[in-house]
């Protein structure tokens, strides 16, 4: 779009334009101003992308000032060591729990305005210094009048309107990019990514969804206790009578987040395997899972149990996607490559003709050549997964759908954990 704006000088614009004729002069001041604002938004997006991809540290304060969408996208990039340096990923991962905080006087005001009636009657002590801060809210320690230690999460501000506005603007930019490069829609679809981010972030902005999500995951755990027990998993106790859309009261969990365990190198490989076993049961066995299980959203408590927190973003994976991926990984772990490639064909609406099947399997064989001989540090699983998805879509007609993105994203999270903690591990142990 031409970005013309009036500076009191004839024909000053961002772009190539000859002197305006009489028709050009019919643009209203509003239209010129809107064009200018769109150019500013585009330049802001380009600056954001440069902050993410440039060598050296990103300006985290600047990113946070761009709003909730910028923070959420940065958190996704933080789990892409195949795209960014390990050092850059580690820096961006600070945004999981070390976001900007609310001044203490504003926290008090929010609680007085937003907390349920009778809230203060149950609080014996409240720490004005935040225990942790994330993109949506921040957490403070407190003690109830009955002596129980809790944490109180407070939504930082009314993010919803600006967040949805930013998403719509980004959608317009992505549609333009897709019109120029249609393959973007088929593989690593940025529109699917944005819709996924919009969906789970919108749910995060209503803290009641954390109680609902935690209860749903705990119910699934109970239903699987006979066939697939998960004794190392638990969920925090919530206090629904003291919570609402803006304020959440839950148990104070003594322990360390996975992020803290990574930083002090205290996360053994066998513990990661147990976490993957648990998360995999939800993703592949049930298809309902924690959709934002980054290293800041899982605590290892004093009893060595995994405690899933921030349970507001519960995702559903299409059964044909989750089951096909499970069979793919199972056969791959047995070095049955042809059977693994065959399993992925289940994601296609109908089986492609034999020429396409042969082409698909040939390309997959190239991707997975020497797979079992390489370590995670030598070959990113995320990179392999992206190439696999691309080949499945282009050569086999697979359709992961927008609903399939959360499970791919969860696999990216797990890959990032392994790369940061045990890069020497073989892809097939």
Which functions belong to the PLM regions below?
Residues 290:
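Histidine-centered phosphotransfer motif of kinases
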Residues 1-280, 287, 295, 299-323, ...:
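Broad phosphate/nucleotide-binding scaffolds in NTP-utilizing and phosphate-metabolizing enzymes
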């Amino acid at each position: 779009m031409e970005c013309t704006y009036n500076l009191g000088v004839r024909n000053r614009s961002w772009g190539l334009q000859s002197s305006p004729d009489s028709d050009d002069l019919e643009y209203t001041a509003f239209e010129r101003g809107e064009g200018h604002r769109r150019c500013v938004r585009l330049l802001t997006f380009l600056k954001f992308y440069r902050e993410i991809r440039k060598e050296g540290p990103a300006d985290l304060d600047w990113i946070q000032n761009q709003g909730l969408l910028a923070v959420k996208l940065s958190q996704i990039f933080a789990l892409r060591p195949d795209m960014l340096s390990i050092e850059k990923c580690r820096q961006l991962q600070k945004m999981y729990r070390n976001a900007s905080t609310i001044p203490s006087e504003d926290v008090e005001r929010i609680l007085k305005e937003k907390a349920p009636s009778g809230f203060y009657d149950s609080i014996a002590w409240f720490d004005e210094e935040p225990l942790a801060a994330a993109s949506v809210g921040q957490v403070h320690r407190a003690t109830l009048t009955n002596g129980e230690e809790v944490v109180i999460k407070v939504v930082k501000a009314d993010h919803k309107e600006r967040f949805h506005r930013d998403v719509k603007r980004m959608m317009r930019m992505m549609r333009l990019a897709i019109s120029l490069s249609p393959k973007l829609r088929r593989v690593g679809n940025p529109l699917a990514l944005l819709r996924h981010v919009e969906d789970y972030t919108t749910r995060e902005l209503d803290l009641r969804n954390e109680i609902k999500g935690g209860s749903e995951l705990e119910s699934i755990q109970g239903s699987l206790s006979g066939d697939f027990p998960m004794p190392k998993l638990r969920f925090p106790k919530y206090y629904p009578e003291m919570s609402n859309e803006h304020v959440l009261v839950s148990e104070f969990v003594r322990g360390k987040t996975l992020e803290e365990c990574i930083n002090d190198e205290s996360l053994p490989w066998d513990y990661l395997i147990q976490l993957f076993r648990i998360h995999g049961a939800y993703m592949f066995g049930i298809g309902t899972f924690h959709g934002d299980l980054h290293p800041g959203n899982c605590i290892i408590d004093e009893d060595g149990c995994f405690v899933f927190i921030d349970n507001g973003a519960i995702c559903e994976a299409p059964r044909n996607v989750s089951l096909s991926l499970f069979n793919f990984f199972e056969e791959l772990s047995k070095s049955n490559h042809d059977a693994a490639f065959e399993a992925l064909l289940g994601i296609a609406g109908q089986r492609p003709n034999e020429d396409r099947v042969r082409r698909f399997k040939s390309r997959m064989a190239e991707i997975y050549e020497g797979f079992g001989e390489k370590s995670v540090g030598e070959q990113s699983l995320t990179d392999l997964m992206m190439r696999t998805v691309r080949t499945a879509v282009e050569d086999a007609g697979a359709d992961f759908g927008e609903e399939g993105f959360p499970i791919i994203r969860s696999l990216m999270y797990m890959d990032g954990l392994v790369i940061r903690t045990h890069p020497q591990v073989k892809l097939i142990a």
